[in-house]
Amino acid sequence: MSSKQEPVVLGKIGSSHGIKGWLKITTYTESVEGIFDYSPWLIKEQGEWREVKVTQWRFQGKAVVASLEGVETRDQAQMLTNCEIAVSAEQMQELPEDEFYWRDLIGCEVTNTKGYNMGKVQEIVETGSNDVLLVKANAKDGFGKAERMIPFVTEQFVLEVNLTEKQILVDWDPDF
């Protein structure tokens, strides 16, 4: 790959399906079929990314299965089990203002309106009602917290996101 940006992982290859090289696909996209909006895929084998093309895909019961170019036997398919599926960062859609890819929020410093550094975003948790920032507190947190869970509700709790500076401003009590 010529891009210096890391590929964006959108899913993972599961077990083989049938004898003609089809594979079960686990997708991390919002909709199950969303992963098929991207082409080509990048598959990580033995630490290296390589490009592959999806030739067909379909729902198989509750699962999604796909056929990849050059994978025509069960043995070839089994060699890809548990490989990550990614796309180049350039393929990601431009988002409207005030919408963010989770991957871009990871590692951002979180500060509240009183200037208290709450820590860094470690991950984002989907709760059903709204997403939640899991913020790993600083080692010497003045409130004795190891982590904080801050609802990602813009204008109410999350006041500003500056991806260039990797900063998030929140209206959140550090003792909560």
From Swiss-Prot:
It is found in: Cytoplasm. Gene3D superfamilies: PRC-barrel domain (2.30.30.240), RimM (2.40.30.60). Pfam families: PRC, RimM. Keywords: Chaperone, Cytoplasm, Ribosome biogenesis, rRNA processing. Its main location: cytoplasm. SUPFAM superfamilies: PRC-barrel domain, Translation proteins. One of its GO terms (molecular function) is ribosome binding. GO terms for cellular component: cytoplasm; ribosome. Residues 96-176 form the PRC barrel domain. GO terms for biological process: ribosomal small subunit biogenesis; rRNA processing. An accessory protein needed during the final step in the assembly of 30S ribosomal subunit, possibly for assembly of the head region. Essential for efficient processing of 16S rRNA. May be needed both before and after RbfA during the maturation of 16S rRNA. It has affinity for free ribosomal 30S subunits but not for 70S ribosomes. Binds ribosomal protein uS19. The PRC barrel domain binds ribosomal protein uS19. Belongs to the RimM family. This is Ribosome maturation factor RimM. The gene is rimM.
